[in-house]
Amino acid sequence: MLQFSSQQMVAIKNKATQSMIDAQKNDNEVVLNNPVLVPEDGRATWNLYYFFPEHGVRLTSARDQPLSHICPVDGKEFTGEPYDGAWWRWLNGLNAKACYDLGLLWQITEEPIHLEIVREILLEYANYYPNYEVHGGIPYNGPGKANAQTLCEANCHIDLARGYDFIKQALTEQEQDKIEKRLLREGAEFLMEHRSAQLHNHEMKINATIGVIGLILDDHRYIDFALNTDYGIHYQLNHGCLGEGMWFEGSVHYHYYALQALLNFEKIAHSTPYSVSNNPNYLKMMKFPLKLVMNNGDFPRLNDSIAGQEKLTHAHLFEFVYKQTPCEEFAQVLTNIYQNISRDNIDALLYGVDELPNAEPIKCQSMHAEQAGLTICYDEARNNSMLLKHAPYGGEHDHYDRLGLILNRNGKEILPDLGTTGYGAELHYGYYKNTSTHNTLVVNQQNQSPINPTLLNYQQNEKFTLVASEANWANKPAEVDSHTLVQWNEEAYRDVCFRRAILWLGDAAVELNTVINPHQQQFDLTYHVRGTHLANEQRKSIVNPLSGALERMRDVQLIESQTEFTQCYAIEGQPEFNQHFAADREVDVVTGYAPDNPATSDIAYSLVRSNQPELKTVLLHDLSEKQTYQLQKVIWCEKQVEFSLLKSNLTRRFRYNQANNQISELAE
């Protein structure tokens, strides 16, 4: 066995608790309690088809009902494709996971049933795998054999290979030869053929699987391909890591998804000459996202992030990396993970230190990362936070939301980033992945074309913080060394320039926006608030004028020709939330409701509409508990704006210079 030495295995056996063993059995009860079932052909497709189109929630499945798929919200049954193929993908995943988990259990408990199940699964796949038809058709993805995409092939094969390593000693030479030739080598060769020449989390997974198979089979050709070729592991780390340590795709989920692949390789390779721990971006990438934990305890749902993936639950990564490279950050994140759950788990058993130090949990912190393009401002006393996304374009998993905004008040998301749902659900491409469902500028209700923003200024002192950035579509379009599908409209954004500065005061955030719109397109400054609109007698009901993702918006109302107004919202469990707005020329305001995430509830939208060649706005987001802020005395000049903020009889006056993007506080 390559994964653990005999001495390590003895120590693991001695430390294993019955609850750990029971947890492993429970996680694999479907395979343990049913006859082994392996598809005879390549009928499996894609697990992300397994979502209800309307609610965007994952369907429920049963091992004995491969043709019946149930929505957990309303009990509706779905049959046929794409759900049947997704069910078989689920089963392939269960089988592969069982190979690893039950193979490990056999090493710990020596119970024959675990060995027999793993042996049968591996031999059955070895029977069929060479003859599985290549099939695919998944957006952005290469094909598979057992499944419909190359990524899924890699995910299954890494568990099949590690499971084989656990039981190899108990197999006959003929069985070993069959599994190695007809399953593991067939899989590695297929993955090598279909690895794409791109930076991508998929390629990290594919490389890791090829490398693990190479380590287990002692095949240096596989190892070298995985590590050292163009688009291999080191290439991905060297070119896919942005300056401060963020994975270029801009999603915290896919950042750790790429690292999960890397660590699956490193857990076997760390004591060999093939360890990747000497790559300087390895630890940078492990540490950087920990700076993005918001004051609700979660990561922001930037870009593609399915509900639930924002949670900090990465024991499988940090147990290992803390033991290999102990430091305060990794001790802190393990404190977070184990705040509400026991450490009596398999990752701590296999890879963790015997006892963790007493460490403070990771907390939200103010952070400015110019190259990653993320700025967080945090007021600890009031538990408020703000995130401005001025990140470069990230490719497939991007959400076309440059200069997007997130606001949290007292630990609760007020202006959230919704993330997304399963990619097979209509709501993914039809709603969540669109510019118009983010707190940013939308032109003609079309998606922003790829652009890399420019940071204009970052100004911080004891009284306030200012961050200013610009997305200018007159500049060269953004490019990324990763496959993309065109899901944007270049013509809509041609020559448009959007400048957004945020003045952070701790209990308020003030937006200073400029939109340059030379071709006089219809544009919207869009805000969605996790709350409900309070009544406003000025609003009148209208037929929804919006196209695209917000065509589904309901209860649409309009206030016309405004230069100053206030939007008020009721927030569950908190006081009201107010937005005070001023513009240098008249705008219309459209309000309504569209899906939150999950789509079982709605979120309140406010769209500030104009088609003027230029618009300047000031927007005060009142994050105070008593909602006592007022926006007053806004004076527009050609290159600057002055405004006053009144709170509890205290007035503060500011001047923002749009020529140099500096802000100063004036004496009243």
Model-derived regions, located:
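Acidic, mature catalytic/reactive cores of soluble proteins
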Residues: 68, 73-77, 90-93, 100-104, ...
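Alpha-helical cores of eukaryotic small-GTPase signaling modules
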Residues: 209-236
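Long, repeat-rich segments with strong aromatic
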Residues: 230-269, 506, 521
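CBM-like, beta-strand-rich accessory domains located in the C-terminal region of large
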Residues: 423-427, 431-668
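Active-site-adjacent structural elements in folded domains
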Residues: 84-86, 143-147, 173, 189-198, ...
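Carbohydrate-active enzyme catalytic cores, enriched for enzymes
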Residues: 211, 217, 253-415, 610-611, ...
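Inter-helical turn/loop segments and adjacent helix faces that build the functional surface
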Residues: 109, 167-178, 217-221, 268-277
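Extracellular glycan-targeting catalytic surfaces
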Residues: 1-198, 204-211, 286, 539, ...
